[in-house]
């Protein structure tokens, strides 16, 4: 199950002479599950971990998502996520940082391998804004799923993805990552062209449909690390009143 990828100023014969010792490795039978099963949830659970004296609350939330691919649902979900939490132009950042001033950053992403995948959103906010930040985050989820992406956001996303592609294969490390990705996932060498075609052809209606299916606030597991004595009561209020958010929040305290 091991592979070696080398990029640098070295030819094949010189490299082989340097790694000749690897021939002494003995192969073993290794069982690797093709997938991992996780319990499904139908409620939005907040796991609260106390950090005495903390001036901020660290918030991370997520749910299961698609396994890694280069031109399927996983890749298209990455495109969809960019206007929401892909960086400083994302809705989370503009709301929580630029508008509210509660945080230095707020991002979301899809992560995946050939075994599993996940969607995650994370930020650190002022302690007194913990519950309000949660409400704003879920408001952004709701808005993106119901109203969808704007044409301006769509064009900005396409330009960002296509623009950064030109700079992704310049260094030795970047080239190594590219080759390793091809080997790991048995990819066609022309997969980049396939991605470019998807980016050029994807529409607002495509993105809106993906957002409705791939973002699941109702299945979100939320972990908050902060000063529980200042935030627990406000978080408990979310169990009975969600400011119009139709999610079944449940608070569970983690002790250590």
Each PLM stretch: what is its role?
Residues 1-31, 99-100, 104-256:
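Charge-rich, well-structured scaffold segments of protease-associated domains
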Residues 30-89, 255-256:
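His/Glu-based metal-binding/catalytic segments typifying zinc-dependent metallopeptidases
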């Amino acid at each position: 199950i091991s592979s070696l990828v080398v990029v640098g100023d070295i030819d094949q014969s010189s490299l082989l002479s340097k790694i000749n010792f690897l021939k002494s490795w003995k192969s073993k039978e290794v069982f690797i599950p093709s997938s991992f099963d996780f319990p499904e949830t139908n409620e939005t659970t907040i796991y609260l971990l106390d950090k005495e004296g903390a001036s901020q609350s660290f918030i991370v939330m997520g749910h299961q998502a698609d396994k890694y691919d280069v031109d399927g649902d996983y890749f298209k979900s990455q495109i969809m996520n960019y206007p929401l939490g892909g960086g400083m132009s994302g809705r989370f950042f503009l709301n929580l940082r630029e508008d509210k001033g509660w945080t230095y950053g707020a991002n979301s992403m899809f992560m995946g391998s050939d075994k599993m995948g996940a969607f995650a959103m994370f930020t650190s906010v002022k302690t007194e804004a913990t519950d309000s930040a949660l409400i704003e985050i879920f408001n952004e989820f709701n808005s993106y799923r119901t109203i969808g992406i704007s044409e301006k956001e769509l064009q900005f996303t396409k330009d960002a993805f296509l623009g950064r592609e030109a700079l992704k294969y310049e260094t030795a490390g970047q080239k190594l990552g590219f080759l390793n990705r091809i080997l790991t996932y048995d990819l066609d060498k022309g997969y980049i062209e396939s991605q470019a075609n998807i980016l050029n052809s994807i529409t607002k209606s495509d993105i809106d449909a993906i957002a409705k299916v791939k973002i699941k606030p109702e299945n979100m597991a939320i972990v908050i690390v902060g000063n529980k004595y200042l935030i627990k009561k406000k978080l408990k209020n979310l169990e009975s009143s969600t400011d119009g958010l139709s999610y079944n929040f449940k608070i569970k305290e983690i002790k250590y």
